[in-house]
Swiss-Prot record:
It catalyses: L-glutamyl-[protein] + L-glutamate + ATP = gamma-L-glutamyl-L-glutamyl-[protein] + ADP + phosphate + H(+); (L-glutamyl)(n)-gamma-L-glutamyl-L-glutamyl-[protein] + L-glutamate + ATP = (L-glutamyl)(n+1)-gamma-L-glutamyl-L-glutamyl-[protein] + ADP + phosphate + H(+). PROSITE patterns: TTL. ATP binds at K160, M166, G167, Q188, E189, Y190, I191, K201, F202, D203, T249, N250. The gene is Ttll7. Residues 388-450 are annotated as: c-MTBD region. This is Tubulin polyglutamylase TTLL7. Highly expressed in brain, testis and trachea. Expressed in brain, heart, kidney, liver, lung, muscle and trachea. In the brain, highly expressed in hippocampus, thalamus, olfactory bulb and cerebellum cortex, corpus callosum and striatum. It comes from Mus musculus (Mouse). Optimum pH is 7.0. Its cofactor is Mg(2+). GO terms for molecular function: alpha-tubulin binding; ATP binding; beta-tubulin binding; metal ion binding; protein-glutamic acid ligase activity, elongating; protein-glutamic acid ligase activity, initiating; tubulin-glutamic acid ligase activity. Polyglutamylase which modifies tubulin, generating polyglutamate side chains of variable lengths on the gamma-carboxyl group of specific glutamate residues within the C-terminal tail of tubulin. Mediates both ATP-dependent initiation and elongation steps of the polyglutamylation reaction. Preferentially modifies the beta-tubulin tail over an alpha-tail. Competes with monoglycylase TTLL3 for modification site on beta-tubulin substrate, thereby creating an anticorrelation between glycylation and glutamylation reactions. The enzyme uses its core to engage the disordered anionic tails of alpha- and beta-tubulin and the flexible c-MTBD (cationic microtubule binding domain) region to bind the microtubule and position itself for beta-tail modification. The c-MTBD region is positively charged and becomes ordered when bound to microtubules: it interacts with a negatively charged patch on alpha-tubulin. The presence of positive charges in the c-MTBD region is essential for proper binding. Residues 38-390 form the TTL domain. PANTHER family: TUBULIN POLYGLUTAMYLASE (PTHR12241), TUBULIN POLYGLUTAMYLASE TTLL7 (PTHR12241:SF147).
Length: 912
């Protein structure tokens, strides 16, 4: 009998119920792959009391984490944080405070550091009122008061707590004897003649963002708050010293006055915006540009005082972090600045935790912009955490397995091993610096796109101003970190720090060449690598067989073109050309142009080479207008379907007037070649033919425009101010004929007397002219689009390499060391482009000789270049000018007998 069911046993509804658990039945559901959630940027805002910070975090799309979470991408705290917390941060995290910033944010520390800097550079730090720190400087203050009494002068002083805030404990005195001697106070001279607005005293709250201290990066927010007093200002006297609503502009003080005006607009009330204030200055005929320039200079000089302290503390917190890596710290600072009646800014104090309260609408508008734009500038990415963890893992494995890129040198190493070791270290140093430069360029591009209302004030774009600030930085390190100033000075003066990517690549290439020499490899010759279009240096490619020339020399008496190609080549060529549409094969649309290589050096070859070029003048389909080998600047400006013009209207610059013999030979060759064009069909691939035709057309156009550029460059001349072309050429020839006499003088002038900025300005005479001419030849809006101009830029950088050694080496016997930059370049340089570069170098050499001669003859400045030259491109001391003489082309077919005009390439010439 069947057994009865027991409790807990699941029974099916029938003997064949599919719901019963059979041993062979699969009850697992098919797994559905869930979409991976996108990365989320997290923020810990437990340390702030301001609601505007949380609102901006939400607006940025960040996710707020629990208060105890210490792994967030962003950590925001109102108060200063301990250095241990910064040490524990991962590289992907950001926190809104720098260690060591208290050196300028505490009133007593700011006064002490400013006093030291004033002793070193008194002319640069004139924006801080005279200050005494009590009790240590009580005696000096009393001596100063006694000197005033002897001169029968009386001044007002403002007394502040050493570490106070929000206006607490501030008072005004006129009798120095009343100041307590043992309290920790700050005593400053009171600015009695401030700039007034509607009769009220006011100060400015300027917001500053520091995104990095290694290297230093400072941004100024072009808006802020104007905080006004609430009683009409009267110069201080014994009767009104206690009226703080008149003399103090702090919001925390004046908001308690019944006369405090709260207004929803930015142009009324006791609190207004700096944006409105700049409009007010402009309406009253004040120099707004100078106002912002003075503010920026004050901010940068103040943060230069803090930089030695901040950088030292930051590196102590992050000991394993290489220089130039992304900073885990940033800071929004509030500068309180007072304007005197001459609009000179005076620094009052700096707040490292400025208030982000939003009592009024103007507070919300200004402070929201400050925070929102600051977070955008930080460029916090969702991938930062993942990349950081992967980097840590790779670094741990490298340490575990001892995978050091540079092997240690044993004590008994030979000279050869020591040289190899030095080269390896040099290459690693260059690679690290190259990586840093590329990161900095990428970061600057992001900053330029997301600055919003911020402006970068350090490093400035003005090179002269940057040199001035760097000099102040050196003084600051010497003043505050005398024990470690030498190491910081060496780091700042490292020549690699100022090199660009192209210069570093050139140095890496040089290291590899030296390494190959050391290893005994002689396979690669220093200099430009053999190009595929040099017949004597490379095998003949299929494309050259079809459309190129043979290795036989050109015979002017020969009238038949069939002897230049063998039968197999002609058959292959005919098969390819057989598939060309009728419109392309027709004699009215196809013209064969022959140019001997000796004419204008179009082919870089020692043996004469004959070049046959097919120029198709009919309309190409859209799919054939763009080729992989076609530069963007060419393909972007090819004629469209509706823009096809007849050959008579096409813009061509003749390179030379052909002789009658060569013209007849060209016509005979064209007719002979046309007779061999087949009219049947072939089974070959049409796509292969179209690709060949596209490459042919774009390469022909590029070569033609490069030939025109070479022709223009050869016709350019450097003109001595006040002399004719012939006189200028005679002057250059005289220097070269007497080179033994001039060599040491020119070397001293170029390599010693001219700094890097002025060396660049000398070459800018040539560079600016070429930059003006190229867009008109290539028909592009900007020369930066051209691959040829990028090649020129590499040549200019090479000439300025190693403080001008690149150009000076061109005066040696070989004079072609600069060509080594193309030996390992991934971009193929054609012979025409190489000839353009050679002419470019020749113009730069002539330009240096003319500038040197002008300086010696006119007894100009020792540098030969006036301070205003950079603004006018060509202007030298006085009213004279260097002229780049070049023909005035209108890009039409002109007869060779036409006269050409001399032009100075400036912005007033809109077209050629």
């Amino acid at each position: 009998m069947p057994s009865l069911p027991q409790d807990g046993v699941i029974q099916g509804s029938s003997p064949v119920d599919l719901g019963t658990e059979l041993p062979y039945q699969c009850t697992m559901k098919r797994k559905v792959r869930k979409k991976k959630k996108k990365g989320i940027i997290t923020a810990n805002v437990a340390g702030t009391k301001f609601e505007i910070v949380r609102l901006v975090i939400d607006e940025m799309g960040f996710m707020k984490t629990p208060d105890e979470d210490e792994t967030s991408n962003l950590i925001w705290c109102d108060a200063a944080v301990q250095q241990e917390k910064i040490t524990d941060l991962q590289n992907y995290q950001r926190i809104n405070h720098f260690p060591g910033m208290g050196e300028i944010c505490r009133k007593d520390f700011l006064a002490r550091n400013m006093t030291k800097m004033i002793k070193s550079r008194p002319m640069d730090y004139t924006f801080v009122p005279r200050t005494w720190i009590f009790p240590s400087e009580y005696t000096q203050f009393q001596n100063y008061v006694k000197e005033l009494k002897k001169k029968r002068k009386q001044k007002t002083f403002i007394v502040k707590p050493a570490n106070g805030a929000m206006g607490h404990g501030i008072s005004l005195i006129r009798n120095g004897d009343k100041v307590p001697s043992q309290d920790h106070l700050i005593v400053q001279e009171y600015i009695e003649k401030p700039f007034l607005m509607e009769g009220y005293k006011f100060d400015l709250r300027i917001y500053i963002l520091v995104t990095s201290c290694d290297p230093l990066k400072i941004f100024l927010y072009h808006d802020g708050l104007v905080r006004m007093g609430t009683e009409k200002y009267i110069p201080p006297n014994e009767s009104n010293l206690t009226q703080l609503y008149m003399h103090l502009t702090n919001y925390s003080v004046n908001k308690h006055n019944e006369r405090f005006e709260r207004n929803e607009t930015e142009d009324k009330g006791s609190k207004r915006s700096i944006k409105w204030f700049t409009e007010f200055l402009q309406a009253n005929q004040h120099d707004v540009t100078k106002f912002w320039s003075d503010i920026s200079e004050l901010v940068v000089k103040t943060l230069i005082v803090a930089e030695p302290h901040v950088l030292h503390a930051y590196r102590m917190c992050r000991p394993g972090q290489p220089p130039g890596s992304e900073s885990v710290c940033f800071e929004v600072l509030g500068f309180d600045i007072l304007l005197d009646r001459k609009l000179k800014p005076w620094l009052l104090e700096i707040n490292r935790a400025p208030s982000f309260g939003t009592d009024q609408k103007i507070d919300y508008d200004v402070k929201r912009g400050v925070l929102l734009n600051a977070l955008k500038l930080l460029n916090i990415r969702t991938s930062d955490k993942r990349k950081n963890l992967a980097k840590q893992k790779a670094e741990a494995q490298r340490r575990l397995y001892g995978q050091n890129p540079v092997r240690r040198l044993s004590p008994g190493s030979s000279d050869w091993e020591q040289q190899r070791h030095q080269l390896e270290r040099r290459k690693e140093e260059l690679k690290e610096r190259l990586l840093q430069v590329r990161k900095q360029v990428s970061q600057e591009e992001h900053e330029n796109r997301h600055m919003g209302n911020y402006r970068r004030i350090y490093p400035p774009e003005d090179k002269a101003l940057l040199e001035k600030y760097e000099g102040l930085l050196a003084v600051a390190f010497q003043t505050f970190l005398s024990g470690r100033a030498a190491s910081f000075q060496r780091e700042m003066n490292n020549p690699l720090k100022k090199m660009r990517e192209e210069d570093l690549l050139d140095l890496l290439e040089q290291c590899e060449i030296d390494d190959e020499k050391l290893m005994g490899k002689t396979g690669r010759v220093r200099g430009p690598k053999p190009l595929c279009c040099m017949p004597e240096c490379a095998e003949v490619t299929k494309k050259q067989k079809y459309y190129g020339s043979s290795d036989s020399s050109y015979d002017s008496s020969s009238s038949s073109s069939n002897s230049e190609l063998d039968e197999n080549e002609k058959e292959l060529c005919q098969k390819r050309l057989d598939q060309v549409p009728y419109s392309l094969k027709h004699t009215s649309h196809c013209k064969i142009i022959q140019q001997p290589s000796g004419s204008h050096n179009l082919i870089y070859s020692e043996s004469p080479v004959y070049l046959t070029t097919l120029v198709f003048l009919s309309e190409f389909p859209d799919s054939m207008r763009r080729s992989v080998s076609c530069p963007r600047s060419i393909s972007a400006h090819l004629p469209s379907r509706g823009d096809v013009r007849p050959f008579s209207s096409q813009q061509v610059i003749p390179l030379a007037r052909p002789t009658s013999a060569s013209r007849s030979h060209s016509l005979n060759r064209a007719s002979s070649y046309a007779r061999h064009l087949p009219h049947g069909s072939d089974t070959g691939s049409t796509n292969t033919l179209n690709e060949s035709l596209r490459q042919l057309k774009t390469k022909e156009q590029e070569d033609d425009l490069t030939s025109q550029t070479l022709f223009v460059l050869k016709d350019m001349r450097i003109r001595f101010p006040g002399k004719s072309d012939a006189e200028s050429e005679l002057l250059i020839e005289d220097i070269m004929d007497n080179w033994k006499h001039y060599k040491t003088k020119v070397a001293s002038y170029w390599l010693i007397k001219l700094d890097s900025v002025k060396q660049r300005k000398v070459l800018d005479i040539v560079k600016s002219s070429i930059r003006t001419v190229l867009p008109r030849i290539w028909r592009v809006p900007d020369a930066e689009e051209l691959s040829l101009y990028r090649i020129f830029n590499r040549v200019f950088n090479r000439l300025l390499w190693s403080h001008g050694q690149g150009l000076w080496s061109c005066f040696c016997d070989s004079g072609s060391s600069w060509e080594s930059i193309f030996s390992k370049s991934p971009e193929v340089v054609t012979p025409l482009q190489l000839q353009c570069c050679q002419r470019l170098v020749e113009l730069c050499k002539q330009c240096l000789l003319v500038v040197y001669k002008y300086t010696t003859e006119t007894r100009g400045p020792i540098s030969g270049i006036g301070p205003d030259w950079g603004n006018s491109r060509y202007l030298l001391p006085g009213s004279t000018q260097f002229l780049m003489r070049s023909p005035l082309y209108n890009m039409k077919y002109n007869s060779p007998g036409m006269t050409r005009s001399n032009v100075l390439f400036t912005s007033r010439y809109g077209r050629l």
